[in-house]
């Protein structure tokens, strides 16, 4: 008889998963899985008020935890199997030896013939500290020549109280004058062509400090000028850098770096993963304001804000072409996110999804697309830069060939009318021509000149040409390719001359390059016959 095979019973977890939804689980299965038995409740509520951690229970060591086993009614606990603790001092102890003994020299016996009175100079005292160094202080006398000694002055009479004037014993402050010059490449001195008399701002400023000494010119040093002097408290000039405030580098964003890195780490993986996300750069400006108009044709609703995720629904059978080819088959377009590129540009991004393949069950399969647009930089206004500096005179530039001369002549006066007249003995024989007034006696030489066509409205291009020492006359020609070239149409009426020619022969002979070949006219060729000889 074959033994029946024992079927394995399902575990408590498997039974709980199958019967929980139907509501047919036994109470013991629910209490086992959800930990609601009596023992579990005792551990939950009892563990909230009693802490047995650190006692080493069920560890097998038997050490009694951190404090050890404490017998009832005794002192602190002792660890089982622990080594005694040796108390060591914090300072290294020193050995105590005998006291230092100072050697005393042997007393020399006194000679009987020596005098009983010992002078101080002949003292033979024992030097107990032979290592002392003799110190000699040299005091130099203060020179008394030309010293102004301030002595107290007592003024007053018998009936008045004495007033004691004490001078300030503090010595004069020593000062030093120094001059520092900094080179600033952005500063240029403007020189004037018409200098005027007076103070110029281009000269260096000289600052005289008190306390540097000096000599009095004229008069005696002890004159009454000293009594008329009035002393002011001098203050030092501040440095040029004392008013500058050191400012650190301002932050580029208001969000802390730690929070920004944590929040943008997942977003960067979703946007810039080239294996899973397609990168598409959008150039249409509608991507910033109305991105839905790039996906499908629709009416513009000004009350709708396109700052949220947009979902586009399309018919499965309809084939629609989007306004922009880059947004083909896009069914979802996320909300805009603003980030900074490594080139310090501001980038607006949207994460979209395409529905390229659709199955019969309605499932849509497509790739994720990262649409982004980098905002261009804002160029600063082109302002005309001016030189840093000041000048007291007027800057005058005179260009003789450019300026025009105006002649104001009164034709009623007889003086100017004599220009260009021949000398006449009669005053009434005044005969002149108005063209004589325009004549000029100066003779101009235009040899070696060049004629330049241009207009004064356009700016003149200045080109610096070096000049070398050479005995020959060197001429330079600068071609102006920035002007306007005016091309006028030219028409030439030439009379065609027809020469009379005789009648041309019927035979045309064409000579080749060698002149040995010719071609006969077809009319001169013989006709072919069937019979050559008749």
From Swiss-Prot:
Motif, Nuclear localization signal: chain positions: 1-10, 526-533
GO terms for cellular component: host cell; host cell endosome; host cell Golgi apparatus; host cell nucleus; viral capsid
MF terms (GO), sorted A to Z: DNA binding; structural molecule activity
Sorted UniProt keywords: Capsid protein, Cytoplasmic inwards viral transport, Disulfide bond, DNA-binding, Host endosome, Host Golgi apparatus, Host nucleus, Host-virus interaction, Late protein, Microtubular inwards viral transport, Phosphoprotein, Viral penetration into host nucleus, Virion, Virus entry into host cell
Family matches, as InterPro entries: Late_L2
Modifications the protein undergoes after translation, according to the UniProt entry: Highly phosphorylated.
Disulphide bridges: 19-25
Cell location: Virion; Host nucleus; Host early endosome; Host Golgi apparatus
Main location: virion
GO biological process: microtubule-dependent intracellular transport of viral material towards nucleus; symbiont entry into host cell; viral penetration into host nucleus
Signal peptide: none
Pfam family, one: Late_protein_L2
Entry keyword annotation includes Secreted: no
Subunit structure: Interacts with major capsid protein L1. Interacts with E2; this interaction inhibits E2 transcriptional activity but not the DNA replication function E2. Interacts with host GADD45GIP1. Interacts with host HSPA8; this interaction is required for L2 nuclear translocation. Interacts with host importins KPNB2 and KPNB3. Forms a complex with importin alpha2-beta1 heterodimers via interaction with the importin alpha2 adapter. Interacts with host DYNLT1; this interaction is essential for virus intracellular transport during entry.
Protein's job: Minor protein of the capsid that localizes along the inner surface of the virion, within the central cavities beneath the L1 pentamers. Plays a role in capsid stabilization through interaction with the major capsid protein L1. Once the virion enters the host cell, L2 escorts the genomic DNA into the nucleus by promoting escape from the endosomal compartments and traffic through the host Golgi network.
Name assigned to this protein: Minor capsid protein L2
Source lineage: Viruses, Monodnaviria, Shotokuvirae, Cossaviricota, Papovaviricetes
């Amino acid at each position: 008889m074959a033994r029946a095979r024992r079927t394995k019973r399902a575990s408590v977890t498997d039974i709980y998963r199958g019967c929980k939804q139907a509501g047919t689980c036994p109470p013991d299965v629910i209490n086992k899985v959800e930990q609601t038995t009596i023992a579990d409740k005792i551990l939950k509520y009892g563990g909230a008020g009693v802490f047995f951690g650190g006692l080493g229970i069920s560890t097998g060591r038997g050490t009694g935890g951190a404090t050890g086993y404490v017998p009832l009614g005794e002192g602190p606990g002792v660890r089982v199997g622990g080594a005694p603790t040796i108390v060591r001092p914090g300072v290294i102890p020193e050995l105590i030896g005998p006291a230092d003994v100072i050697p005393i020299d042997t007393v020399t016996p006194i000679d009987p013939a020596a005098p009983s009175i010992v002078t101080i100079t002949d003292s033979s005292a024992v030097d107990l500290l032979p290592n002392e160094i003799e110190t000699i202080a040299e005091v130099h006398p203060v020179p008394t020549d030309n010293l102004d000694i301030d002595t107290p002055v007592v003024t007053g009479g018998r009936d008045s109280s004495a007033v004691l004037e004490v001078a300030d014993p503090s010595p004069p402050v020593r000062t030093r004058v120094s001059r520092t010059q900094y080179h600033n490449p952005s500063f240029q001195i403007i020189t004037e062509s018409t200098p005027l008399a007076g103070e110029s701002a281009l000269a260096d400023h000289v600052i005289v400090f008190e306390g540097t000494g000096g000599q009095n010119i004229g008069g005696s040093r002890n004159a009454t000028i000293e009594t008329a002097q009035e002393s002011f408290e001098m203050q030092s000039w501040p440095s040029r850098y004392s008013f500058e405030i050191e400012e650190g580098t301002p932050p580029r964003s208001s969000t802390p770096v730690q929070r920004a890195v944590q929040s943008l780490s997942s977003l960067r993986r979703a946007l810039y993963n080239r294996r899973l996300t397609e990168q598409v750069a959008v150039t249409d400006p509608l991507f910033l304001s109305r991105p839905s108009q790039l996906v499908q044709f629709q009416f513009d609703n000004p009350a709708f804000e396109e700052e949220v995720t947009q979902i586009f629904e399309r018919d499965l059978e309809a084939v629609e072409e989007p306004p922009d080819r880059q947004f083909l088959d896009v069914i979802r377009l996320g909300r805009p996110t603003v980030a900074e590129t490594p080139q310090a540009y501001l980038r607006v991004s949207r994460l979209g999804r395409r529905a390229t393949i659709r199955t019969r069950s309605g499932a849509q399969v497509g790739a994720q697309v990262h649409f982004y647009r980098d905002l261009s930089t804002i160029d600063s206004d082109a302002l005309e830069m001016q030189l840093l500096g000041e000048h007291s005179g007027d800057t005058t530039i005179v260009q003789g060939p450019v300026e025009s001369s105006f002649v104001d002549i009164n034709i009623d006066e007889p003086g100017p009318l004599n220009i260009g007249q021949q000398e006449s003995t009669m005053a009434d024989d005044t005969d002149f021509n108005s063209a004589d007034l325009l004549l000029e006696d100066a003779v101009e030489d235009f040899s070696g000149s060049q004629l330049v066509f241009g207009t004064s409205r356009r700016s003149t291009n200045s080109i610096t040409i070096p000049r070398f020492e050479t005995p020959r006359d060197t001429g330079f020609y600068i071609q102006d390719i920035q002007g306007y070239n005016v091309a006028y149409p030219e028409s030439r009426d030439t009379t065609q001359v027809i020469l009379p020619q005789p009648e041309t022969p019927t035979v045309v002979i064409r000579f080749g390059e060698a002149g040995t070949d010719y071609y006969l006219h077809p009319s001169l060729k013989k006709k072919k016959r069937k019979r050559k000889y008749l």
